[in-house]
Regions:
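Short, well-structured N-terminal submotif of metal-dependent ribonuclease cores
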Residues: 1-37, 49-63
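Conserved glycosyltransferase catalytic-site signature
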Residues: 6, 39, 96-99
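Alpha-helix N-cap/helix-start and coil->helix boundary motif
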Residues: 9, 42-43, 55, 76-79, ...
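Short, mixed-charge aromatic SLiMs
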Residues: 31-32, 64-74
Length: 113
């Protein structure tokens, strides 16, 4: 499964985005792959896609591409792992979604970002 990060997801949903065409091209290259998204990425995408029509497009993209919801553990262990990862890579200034993607893909080697 390929985990989708915020930038390509937003680009798929907003034709005005500078990376829209690149995202469409990359999506075609990944047509045979299973795609997934975590809650933190959806939260960031909704922040960037503030208009109702953009969020409707987000919902359509999730549905049409059958993008799986990648569950995250709601336990302190998961949060601690993410916080530890954020601390380890603090010089790169990662955000919570970056940490979630890193920890999820680290827990399951079948997941790629």
């Amino acid at each position: 499964m390929i985990l989708i990060d915020t930038t390509p997801l937003v680009a798929l949903c907003d034709a005005r985005a500078s990376l829209h065409r690149v995202a469409l091209r990359d999506l075609q290259a990944l047509a045979s792959e299973r795609l997934g998204v975590c809650e933190a990425v959806l939260m960031e995408a909704c922040f960037h896609l503030a208009a109702d029509v953009q969020r409707q497009r987000l919902r359509a993209v999730l549905d049409q591409l059958n993008i799986a919801a990648v569950p995250r553990a709601d336990d302190r262990g998961f949060w601690t792992e993410v916080l530890d990862w954020l601390s380890k890579y603090a010089d790169h200034e990662p955000d919570w979604a970056d940490g979630c993607l890193a920890v999820l893909s680290g827990r399951d080697t079948g997941l790629k970002v």
